[in-house]
Regions:
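Residue-level detector of solvent-exposed, low-hydrophobicity positions
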Residues: 10, 17, 29, 40, ...
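Residue-level signal for secondary-structure boundary elements
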Residues: 15, 19-22, 48, 68, ...
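Long, hydrophobic or amphipathic alpha-helical segments
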Residues: 50-56, 60-63, 67-70, 74-77
């Protein structure tokens, strides 16, 4: 199993505790995970090792805030 597949497997396991509603999307769930995991891994490996942790943490913060805002918008509907 390559690193992208390992990332996808772990992410899919994490999703099982907080499932995403894929019903209204026209992309296969596993394909979406593979696409994004490959992109994230490419970005990670293309970053200087001494900068990786800070960039990774900043990215997690940005995505968490984005998810928070999207969830608030959905709850207002």
């Amino acid at each position: 199993m390559n690193l992208t597949e390992q990332l996808v497997e772990l992410a899919e396991q994490i999703e099982s505790s907080d499932p995403i509603d894929w019903g209204m999307l026209s992309i296969n769930e596993h394909d979406a995970y593979m696409l994004i995991a490959g992109s994230v891994l490419d970005s990670y490996l293309g970053t200087e090792p001494d900068s990786r942790d800070m960039i990774l943490l900043a990215t997690v913060v940005k995505l968490t805030v984005e998810n928070f805002v999207l969830n608030l918008k959905l709850m207002q509907k």
